[in-house]
Amino acid sequence: MLFVNSTKVEELIKNSPAGKNTKFLSAAHSLWYRFKNYEKSPPMAYEDNGEVVCLIFATFNRDGYANLYEIVTLEGKEGNGYASKCWDSWIKYAVEERNTKRLKISCTPSSVTWHYRNGLIFWAVDPTGSLRSDQPLFPSRAEQLSYRTTAIGNPNTALPPSKARDQFKSEGLE
């Protein structure tokens, strides 16, 4: 995994074939640029044979949280497991190098199965139908899956902190 700057992401967009993933990458780039996240939280890229094939856009804060915004596989590279490999590398980095303890994420219903395979659980649905979560983050998929199994068996052990639950409620989330 490596960090990439806005120039590299623009190059990837320019050189990618048109399609939904290129459009998604372009939107992620615009968001990152608008929020000035390239300076403090550059996207992490996963490479296959020296070629960037997947990117993760996430931020880290001092409270031990990571906020995951986007995971995008480049157009034409889908179906090779790159997003999963990128995710595996990212969670290891987040926990072991950034000392991340918890993950905040919002995802669309179409991506729930992918996130479920990675051991994530969701606690709220916003008015647009996106699912929201605030949960512990572990350095491996196996540990994340084990945590999810425990959470399913005893949901009280996995409730988000009261501050997160209060935020979900204040935003009118189900």
Language-model-detected regions and their locations in the chain:
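Residue-level recognition of the GNAT/N-acetyltransferase active site
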Residues: 74, 78, 108
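Short hydrophobic/aromatic beta-strand element in the GNAT-like acyltransferase core
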Residues: 40-45, 55, 70, 104
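Conserved active-site alpha-helix within GNAT-family acetyltransferase domains
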Residues: 99, 108-132
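Conserved beta-strand in the GNAT
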Residues: 51-59, 67-72
